[in-house]
Amino acid sequence: MVIGVVGDSGSGKTTLSAAIAAEIAAQVGPRVTGHSRVTSICLDDYHRYDRAARSRLDLTALAPECNRLDLMAEHLQALKRGASVVKPVYNHEHGTFDPDEHVTPGDIVIARGLLALHTAELRSAFDLTVFLDPDPALRIRWKIARDTAKRGYTAEQVIQHIRRRHTDYERYVAPQRAHADVVIMYAPAPDGTLTLRTDVRTKRDVSIVLAAAERARGQAVSAASVPVEAR
């Protein structure tokens, strides 16, 4: 089974993917027949260009031409069949590529990325898909908190990137919401916690995903407020 977790940068894809894996481990066990039950991969690894090249070409990572979508679909289909793949690895800290890695699928593969539902070929690789659509201001806070802590950016640089990427988000990322089986929406609550709303559009059992969304809500911490002009 292949589960796709899709959304903009900073929308909570990594947190939700980890929560889904944790729910699977809690409900059905973490391992079976000597191997991990869940394999998780980041589809940012399929960027076509490193950070410096994207800057030279004036492309954002959200643009389809900036990603190896055909190879992504090929590898997802192979993992769905139970076959191993040798995939690229993108290093977010340095904005470069690390050596390729060998991936053997578990019973369940969780693939998270920006454009996982962009093409029909990609969509056909998934058994269940989730789109993360948090409140825009919350997403900005999450992205600033992550990118300043883990990727070496200043808050001002993150805000500039968000502004620059907004058109590509609206053009390429947001429309994928229509193809998702489950849409998860977080928003700030007056008491400082987060509210959670879901839109389920499938008859499949999605109880693990919904439990994971609640688990992720409990783990999420709102970052400090950001300027309105960053929106």
Language-model regions, residue ranges each:
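Short hydrophobic/aromatic beta-strand immediately N-terminal to the Walker A/P-loop
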Residues: 2-4
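The conserved Walker
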Residues: 9
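Conserved lysine of the Walker
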Residues: 13
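Hydrophobic positions on the alpha1 helix immediately C-terminal to the Walker A/P-loop
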Residues: 16
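Post-Walker A helix-loop "phosphate-sensing" segment adjacent to the P-loop in P-loop NTPases
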Residues: 21-39
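Conserved nucleotide-sensing/catalytic segment adjacent to the nucleotide-binding pocket
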Residues: 39-42, 48-94, 108
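ATP-dependent NMP and nucleoside kinases share a basic, alpha-helical "lid"
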Residues: 98-151
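NTP-dependent small-molecule kinase module
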Residues: 167-231
